[in-house]
């Protein structure tokens, strides 16, 4: 088996799992592929393995679904491994894990029963952790960031990991759009991220649990109402203006990927709406619109896999900007299209502010965002 030595070399932290890696003869696998009882795994254009259906008739445990879910788990594991190894984090100190991708694992009787979080914790070796899955389409990462902050601030847990794997379904969707328009497959990566939220240490940036924006049931779906609920309302309640935030992290899709697919420049569109709201509220002169977008915005760079680009990719950079750089305040904004699930026509979204740590350990309105590694 050519794959096993590579894994053993690159990921020694996963050594307890190596005994489960056993090669097998796949020369007669074509029949399984033809009957959809297995999904092939390819490496360098050749079949190197396959994922079998976990049940004969349950579509929730079909080879296709198992493939999607195992990609979420595996990419989430890689993100969590990067987090703990590159930041020298003691795995035994992590109490709780929140997984916030957009897939669901379960069987015919409980299709979204879960739990990706616990399965990732098991492989990474987080022996003292439990966890659960949080879902909210693309808004889930920021929902999870707020939940993790609340759990730490309340004293329920000291260290909470927020993690998510990528989406093969979104890869396929994007590839389909590119090919349809005459382009090659432009997005060829699976995204993933992991963040550790810990108690305020007086050094790392703090998450302001008192500056949280939210799209409520009564908010509505107009762009102005959405941006107001997510950005300006929570700032105003704390005596701040839109211009008091140094950087906004919104839907950070890479425009080089989205524009050829016909989706435009998503981050830029978000920043234009925030800037327009600032002008309307008198926080910004209309002549400064373009400059606001340049100064307060970011160029999208993240894979376009739904939850992966939704606000969270800037977290690691924000830590650096709020410690080594000259920023004092940034905002993370996550939005989600709940109507895709056909349970409601409502939109969704939440936001939270991260600030430079002033060194005052007794501040109970914030927790420390200790470290982050994203985009595997």
Residue positions per predicted region:
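Claisen-condensing/thiolase-fold acyl-transfer catalytic domains that form or cleave C-C bonds
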Residues: 1-6, 29-32, 36-42, 67-69, ...
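Glycine- and small hydrophobic-enriched segments that form the cores of compact globular domains
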Residues: 28-179, 185-210
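Short, mixed-charge aromatic SLiMs
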Residues: 101-104, 167-176, 217-221, 256, ...
